[in-house]
């Protein structure tokens, strides 16, 4: 159960962080057809509550489950499938946050590197990303906590206890008919709370950076 929670959380950190940084850079630095429409669409997608998408997501995961090889990793009732859904739901917010940080990075160094013949990918990796490390770290913390505490999506798209994560296990400990062992409930709850406590202790400045990146970025 702890392993499933870590798989979901770490997958979200990697998936949301890498995709959001690439998409945010493209939306911040490049003018292409449909750019504003894409930005508006990400906001619309983020406005949808995840509960309204559960039926559609169910059919998508069942379809993926039928694909040989891939279905065993990313299909219905797999930790990879849950991570895929959680990544998709978190991407709109991640893209907007990263775009805000990229908007605050000066063009001068980037233009010099492009004039010298560096590719866009190399400029993004070697010049731009090091300047937005606080934003990447803050986004990683948010996505980790989202995956670590996820309940609705894992509870909907998993069967049995093999793929249960910590929130599901914590809910199962509090049965309606059997007596609840509150010592175990308290221990599991405290264990699940540890990343949250670390988050509040060590990431206060990163939260302020996220706020400044989100409100100062232009379109």
Segments the model singles out, each with a brief description of its role:
Residues 1-219:
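A hydrophobic, multi-pass inner-membrane permease signature
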């Amino acid at each position: 159960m702890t392993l499933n929670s870590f798989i979901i959380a770490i997958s979200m950190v990697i998936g949301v962080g890498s995709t959001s940084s690439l998409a945010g850079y493209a939306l911040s630095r490049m003018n292409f057809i449909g750019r504003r429409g894409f930005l508006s669409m990400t906001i619309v997608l983020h406005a949808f509550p995840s509960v309204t998408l559960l039926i559609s997501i169910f059919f998508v995961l069942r379809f993926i489950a039928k694909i040989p090889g891939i279905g065993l990793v990313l299909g219905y009732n797999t930790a990879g499938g849950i991570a895929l859904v959680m990544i998709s739901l978190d991407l709109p917010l991640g893209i907007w946050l990263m775009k805000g940080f990229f908007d605050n990075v000066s063009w001068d160094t980037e233009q010099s590197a492009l004039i010298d013949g560096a590719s866009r990918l190399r400029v993004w990796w070697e010049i731009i990303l090091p300047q937005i490390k606080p934003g990447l770290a803050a986004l990683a913390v948010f996505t980790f906590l989202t995956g670590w505490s996820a309940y609705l999506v894992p509870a909907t798209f998993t069967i049995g206890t093999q793929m249960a994560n910590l929130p599901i296990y914590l809910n199962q400990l509090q049965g309606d008919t059997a007596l609840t062992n509150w010592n175990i409930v308290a221990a599991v709850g405290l264990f699940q709370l540890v990343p949250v406590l670390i988050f509040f202790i060590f990431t206060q400045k990163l939260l302020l950076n996220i706020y400044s990146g989100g409100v100062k970025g232009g379109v």
